[in-house]
Amino acid sequence: MKTAIITGASAGIGMELARVLAKAGHPLILVARSEEKLSALKNELEKKHRVSVDYLVKDLSEKNACQEIFDAVQLKKIEIDILINNAGFGDFSDFANADWEKLNQMIQLNITALTHLTKLFLPQMIAKRYGRIMNVASVAAFQPGPYMAVYFATKAYVLSFSEALSGELKETGVSISTLCPGPTESNFMEVSNMSESAFIKGKKFPSSLSVAEYGYKSMMQGKTVAIHGTGNYFLANLNRFVPRKWVVGITSKLMRKAT
């Protein structure tokens, strides 16, 4: 069975992806900052699904973390067949008043770490003519996002980067899928403070498990862009239905702080 490495595996969509892949029989390497959560998840998955689960405690916003992860995997002589770049976070704030350190950390995690891990693991996949890569973006990738300007921009990068790579990887045996969920019931809302936005407050959203199941199926089928949910598909294609200059206004109304 193909071995997978999953970043941001200690909560939300990442944790559910770990559960979905373990259920399918994949040996796993889990990456996140919390050893306590990773250890608990390892014990759960090994007991329930009888698969091999290892983990690495790393903060991917730190400069050398990606190389250290790659080196640790090489030292264990584990071949990675599936790379899931799930780690990321957002911040609900107008740009002028946002904390620069948090924004910089977001860029490092959402863009730099994802790109670096892909660069490190991709050559081996190409060499053996098999690999599956899932980069987790968002429906936010398809339009600018006032009050979460940097987050939306990082996800636009993930989508553009992944689609470009999919063009390079044709006939290599390696496929790259971009998972684009909308708002999801997870800890993302709390971490980003997004629960205060008009679009989110008081509403119910899909579970992390439903997103993870859809993402895994789409990745294994080699789907290039996987948008979860009919409503999210409409939002992702908003530019097709209305002039682009209107899109910022519509998104601004959706994203502003609820009154």
Q: What is the predicted role of each segment?
A:
Residues 10-12:
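Conserved glycine-rich cofactor-binding loop
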Residues 24-40:
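Conserved glycine-rich Rossmann-like NAD(P)H-binding loop of the short-chain dehydrogenase/reductase
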Residues 68-71, 93-97, 101-108:
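Active-site Tyr-X3-Lys motif and surrounding loop/helix of classical short-chain dehydrogenase/reductase
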Residues 86-91:
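Conserved NAD(P)H cofactor-binding loop of Rossmann-fold oxidoreductase domains
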Residues 118, 154:
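Active-site helix of classical SDR
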Residues 138:
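Residue(s) in the substrate-gating loop at a strand-loop-helix junction
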Residues 178, 199-236:
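C-terminal helical subdomain
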